Amino acid sequence: RGLGDVYKRQPLLNYTVSGVIWYQGESNVSRRNEYKDLLTAMISDWRQRWNKSDMPFYIIELADFLSPTDKGGRTAWAEFRKAQAEVADTNKNVTLIKNSDLGEWNDIHPLDKKTLGQRVAAAILIEMNTKNRK
C-alpha cells in the first residue's frame, strides 16, 4: 500500500457504499501468484474502513484474451482467473461474475458490454432479493 493509494481512497470514505463491482486485473497477471492474497486483503480493508463486514463484492472475471497459439500467456490468464475464483469461493459475500466467454483474442477489452452488464445486474438483484427475504 502506498501513500498515493490512501490519498485516492480517502475522499470516498465520506460516501455511502452498498457494494463494490471490481473490474480489474489485466495489469496484475504477472503477479497472479500473490493476487488472491492481495485482493482478499483489499476486500477486508475496504469492509473495515466502511464498517460493513458483509459489504458485497462482485469480481468481474478477467476476460479471455490472446491468440490461441500463445500457450504461455493463455495459461497465465487462466491461472489469474483461478485466483479470482478462489477469492470468491473463500470470502463471504463475494461473487465472481463470468466474463471469460466474452473476450476477444485481439482486444483486451471485450466488445460485448451489454451481456456483461446484464450479468452484473442479475448478480446484484439476486443478492438484494436474498437479503430482503431475511
Which residue stretches match the model-derived regions?
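Extracytoplasmic/secreted proteins, especially bacterial periplasmic and envelope-associated proteins
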Residues: 34-41, 45, 75, 79-83, ...
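Active-site-proximal beta-strand/loop segments in catalytic clefts of secreted hydrolases
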Residues: 22-27, 46, 60-64, 98-102
